[in-house]
Design a protein with these regions (language model features):
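Short, surface-exposed binding/anchoring microloops in extracellular/periplasmic proteins
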Residues: 22-24, 36
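Structural signal for glycine-centered tight turns and loop->strand junctions in beta-sheet-rich domains
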Residues: 28-32
Length: 137
């Protein structure tokens, strides 16, 4: 399914030069999707941190209570206080990126983490741990 105007609650996408983008998103109505395998590789000169149209594969649904847990975790984690770009240990020539987008209570935040790995930002680690627990992301 191609990206549409659905309301995204939380989404993360990992983009690397030599791999198709991978990621998950949960829509405001509780449906969750993962990136489809037929997405194209980034071009050799394309900035990895730009938003791109992706195909998504429906995967399941979470409950209203689980949506509330995600919203609370996003608010309480400090995610909305992060800088828009996290250049942590930035020493690679063309590092991959993780692009996180969260929409809660009318507030939207997009954070790009360069060379994404666990323990780059505690705020993001909390959200990632919750997504792993809820949907296996």
């Amino acid at each position: 399914m191609a990206e549409a105007t659905q309301s995204v609650l939380i989404q993360y996408i990992i983009v690397q030069r030599d791999q198709v983008p991978i990621g998950w998103r949960i829509l405001a109505d509780g449906r969750y999707e993962r990136t489809a395998a037929d997405n194209a590789l980034p071009t050799p000169t394309e900035p990895l941190d730009r938003d791109r149209a992706l195909n998504w594969q429906p995967t399941g649904t979470i409950t209203a209570e689980q949506i509330q847990v995600i919203e609370k975790t996003a608010r309480d984690s400090g995610f909305f206080n992060l800088q828009p770009r996290l250049l942590i240990n930035y020493c690679k020539d063309d590092p991959g990126v993780a692009i996180w987008t969260v929409n809660v209570d009318g507030q939207q935040k997009r954070v790009v983490v360069y060379d994404p790995k666990p323990k780059r930002a505690a705020e993001i680690d909390k959200l990632k741990a919750l997504l792993t627990e809820l949907i296996g992301a």
